[in-house]
Amino acid sequence: MRKLLVDTIQGKKEETVFNLNDFPFEHLTTCDLCKKGTHRKYYNVASAFDIETTNVDGVKNAKGEYIVSPFAFMYHWQFCLDIFVIFGRTWEEFTEFFDKLSEECGAFTLCIYVHNLAFEYQFIKDFIEIENMFAKAKRRPMKFTSHKGAIEWRCSYFLSNMSLAKFCESSELCIHYKLLG
C-alpha cells in the first residue's frame, strides 16, 4: 500500500493505492447483496476496471513489407472496488488478482464496469476464460462472465452512450480525475 498525491481538476488529492499483497479482498464480505430475478445474487458495490495501452509501429524493409509487425500492449491496469484501488503492471498480476477476487466472491457475482469493454476485451481475452458473452457484434461485447460466473464484466459505454468525461460530468457526485490536455 502506498499514498499518492494525485493532480485533479480540484487540486491535489491524496489517494491510497494497494498492491496484490495488501488489497483488502475481505471488503466484499461487508457489501450488501442484491438479487436479479431468481438467478444469482450480486454484490451491491461499485467496481470498475481500466487498462492503459500503447502501440508500437512496425518496421518495414525497402519494399515496404513489414519485417516486424506493429503491435500494442498493456503497460498498466487498475481496478477499483468501492473506495479501494489497486494498480498492476503485468498480466501475471492481473490473473492472480482476479483469481483471488473470484475466490472471495464465493457463490455471488461481482459486476465490474469497464468503459468501452470492446477495447479492453481485445487485451484481456487471452488471460481469462470468457463465459456467457452477450455482444452487439463480433468482438463488441456488451457483457460477459468469467471465473465460473463469479465476475461479470459490463460495458458502461453501452449503458451510458457517453464518453467517460461526459458520463462523469452528468453523474452526481462523480469526479473525473483525468486531466485534459
Language model segments and positions:
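N-terminal accessory regions of nucleic-acid-interacting proteins
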Residues: 1-51
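Aromatic-residue detector
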Residues: 2-3, 54-59, 119, 163, ...
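Acidic surface patches and DE-rich sequence motifs
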Residues: 8, 61, 146
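Conserved non-catalytic scaffold segment of RNase H-like nuclease domains
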Residues: 21, 30-32, 42-47, 51-117
